[in-house]
């Protein structure tokens, strides 16, 4: 099965399992690390993910993956929380984490409200309105970034 098909099918199965457990899929990675093939899921739920949650998802989804036989050959399967630097992937993430410190990287340089062009924005996430992310920058400016211009966005840990 082609990599894109594996990712699509595993995502579908993972979302079914996670939904039944009151959790969500944050990100799915399927890639080679050295000579080893790795399938890695990052999961989350309201209040945070515990080790028991990761074990339950790993056990339940492993059984389904065995039966479905989607991935041929040996691979390592990991289930983890997204961590303190959780990626923001869906539009709802930008609403859910409003008020938090974020780092956003864009595909191309965009201007903040002072006209300064940049590809990296660090500041307080204000939310999502009409497909655009609003952020109050550390330097005092603000920026409005279209979702389709975001290459990567993560929560930042505040000390």
UniProtKB/Swiss-Prot annotation:
The keyword Protein transport does not apply. Gene3D superfamilies: Ribosome maturation factor RimP, C-terminal domain (2.30.30.180), RimP-like superfamily, N-terminal (3.30.300.70). GO terms for cellular component: cytosol. It is found in: Cytoplasm. Transmembrane segments: none annotated. Pfam families: DUF150_C (PF17384), RimP_N (PF02576). One of its GO terms (biological process) is ribosomal small subunit assembly. Keywords: Cytoplasm, Ribosome biogenesis. Its main location: cytoplasm. Required for maturation of 30S ribosomal subunits. Belongs to the RimP family. This is Ribosome maturation factor RimP.
């Amino acid at each position: 099965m082609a990599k894109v098909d594996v990712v699509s099918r595993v995502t579908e199965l993972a979302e079914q399992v996670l939904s039944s457990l009151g959790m969500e899929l944050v990100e799915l990675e399927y890639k080679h690390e050295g000579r080893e093939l790795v399938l890695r899921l990052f999961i989350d739920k309201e209040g945070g993910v515990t080790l028991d949650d990761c074990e339950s998802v790993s056990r339940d989804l492993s059984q389904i993956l065995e039966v479905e036989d989607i991935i041929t050959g040996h691979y390592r399967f990991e289930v983890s929380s997204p961590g303190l630097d959780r990626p923001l992937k869906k539009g709802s993430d930008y609403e859910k984490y409003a008020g938090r410190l974020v780092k956003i990287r864009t595909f191309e340089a965009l201007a903040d409200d002072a006209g300064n062009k940049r590809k990296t924005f660090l500041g307080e996430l204000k939310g999502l309105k009409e497909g655009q992310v609003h952020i109050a920058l550390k330097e005092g400016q603000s920026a409005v970034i279209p979702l389709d211009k975001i290459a990567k966005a993560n929560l930042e840990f505040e000390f």
